């Protein structure tokens, strides 16, 4: 069941997002509206960081190795850009629907999405590096208006 939320790009509280991350780092800024003059809990804190650079950014990766359970992705695996660690995974699983190993994680916020798209990325599991690609959108592109 966990892979279904990952295929749809849904974050897991406690793994993919926690009090340590803000909405901008987690890629959830689309859920914040400043158009209405409504004071909500945390509004002033979010407004303070709205235009500041982010220290880390949430990403989705698919591995080029596409065997179920190989590698066994869990969380806290290092993410490499070439030979430098740039972040850590937060969740991982194999998608039987899409025949892909999928992992979520956070990487340095100063690396652009364009650079990540064209870069040689790797995820290290059990001392072995697996080639990975940035997944720009969720694998499952359902329209959730009916849910």
Where are the language model's segments positioned?
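Conserved, structured C-terminal
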Residues: 1-147
